[in-house]
């Protein structure tokens, strides 16, 4: 028995040495796709009608249908700068009847294997949302594709998504770095809430609605953040501007710093908020939700105001009170707009109730939109100006 074991050891060692990776691809034979831009194809209207009719079609007619135009952007690693760690962008644009079809057509046009494990940016053309049946197929593919990076950032773009991939930013080598950095900077002042694929899937499954950042392209080179789109059933219901997004993130308690402004005696005064403490008290009485927001902030005054001489002055208290009233009014208008007009829970109130008040959630979950619309919501805002800046 011992001799048999001794004889088996060399065989096992040889088998380990002969083991290899059967599907390995050299790194210089890969195209690391960083940006995926999806536009409508010339035949998308016909494709949408076929989906709605639920008719069976021949394979030949499917193959001829250019439903989508997809652009894959990737860095040119042949000319990568070793010091900067970056390279200029290359792209491949193909048309097809589905995301799978465009992928295989892109492979046929490329001498390299497309790799999606490091993808950073997904650009969805605004026109796609005019065809929710097609967009649903696109998103189903994206959600299920195992090779796609789950932290890829998602955005909606006005105009052709392909045009954004071709932009050469002044401050970055690649468009994916530029837009993701732009969203990162904007999130610091509360004007945008970056959304990656994982967060998008969670929003859709939890609320059947989502919000995505919206960008526009001016003069073929100037990319601007214009706000956020509210999406339900793969259709854009409305848009939220930067100020509304700031208020949403304050009410969510999901913001680090931001800026608010008022006008006092002809002077514009900026209040740079450094800290936000948000509390939401939730109660359920007489078959009705009762919600109370308490928002406490600390920050610094910016801009010119001649009478702001000391933190103890009555003028500072007046300014604080004016900001309290202004912000409370903005918050109330936003809440009424989102629950009565949009009928979408963009404030994630349902998430708070589900996580921390399960008993209340069981009472309202079957009729959540109506329960939110009928809820009594009150708001209290307390601003604390800690600093008025330097003066001579």
PLM features: residue spans?
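Membrane-proximal alpha-helical signals and transmembrane carboxylates
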Residues: 7-10, 15-392
């Amino acid at each position: 028995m011992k001799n048999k074991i001794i004889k088996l050891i060399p065989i096992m060692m040889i088998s380990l040495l002969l083991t290899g990776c059967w599907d390995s691809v050299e790194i210089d034979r890969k195209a690391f796709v960083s940006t995926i831009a999806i536009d409508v194809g010339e035949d998308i209207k016909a494709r949408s009608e076929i989906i709605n009719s639920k008719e069976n079609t021949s394979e030949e007619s499917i193959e001829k249908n250019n439903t989508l135009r997809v652009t894959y952007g990737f860095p040119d690693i042949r000319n990568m700068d070793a010091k900067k760690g970056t390279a200029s962008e290359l792209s491949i644009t193909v048309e097809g009847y589905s995301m799978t079809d465009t992928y295989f057509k892109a492979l046929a046009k490329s001498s390299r294997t497309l790799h999606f494990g490091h993808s950073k940016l997904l650009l969805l053309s605004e026109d796609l949302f005019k065809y929710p049946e097609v967009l649903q197929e696109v998103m189903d593919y994206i959600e299920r594709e195992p090779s796609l990076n789950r932290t890829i950032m998602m955005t909606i773009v006005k105009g052709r998504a392909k045009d954004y991939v071709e932009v050469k930013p002044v401050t970055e080598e690649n468009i994916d770095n530029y837009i993701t950095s732009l969203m990162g900077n904007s999130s610091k002042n509360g004007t945008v809430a970056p959304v990656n694929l994982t967060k998008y899937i969670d929003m859709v499954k939890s609320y059947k609605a989502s919000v995505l950042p919206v960008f526009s392209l001016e003069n073929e080179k100037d990319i601007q953040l214009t706000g956020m789109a509210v999406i339900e059933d793969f259709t854009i219901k409305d848009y939220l501007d930067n100020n509304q997004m700031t208020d949403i993130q304050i009410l969510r308690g999901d913001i680090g710093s931001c800026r608010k402004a008022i006008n006092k005696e002809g002077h514009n005064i900026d209040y740079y908020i450094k800290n936000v403490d948000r509390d939401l008290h939730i109660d359920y009485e007489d078959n009705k939700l009762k919600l109370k927001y308490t928002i406490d902030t600390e920050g610094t005054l910016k801009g010119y105001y001649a009478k702001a001489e000391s933190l103890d002055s009555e003028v500072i208290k007046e300014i604080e009170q004016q900001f309290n009233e202004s912000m409370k009014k903005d918050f109330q208008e936003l809440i009424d707009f989102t629950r009565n007009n949009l009928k979408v829970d963009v404030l994630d109130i349902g998430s708070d109730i589900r996580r921390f008040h399960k008993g209340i959630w069981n009472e309202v979950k079957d009729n959540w939109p109506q329960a939110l619309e009928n809820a009594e919501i009150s708001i209290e805002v307390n601003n604390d100006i800690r600093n008025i800046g330097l003066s001579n």
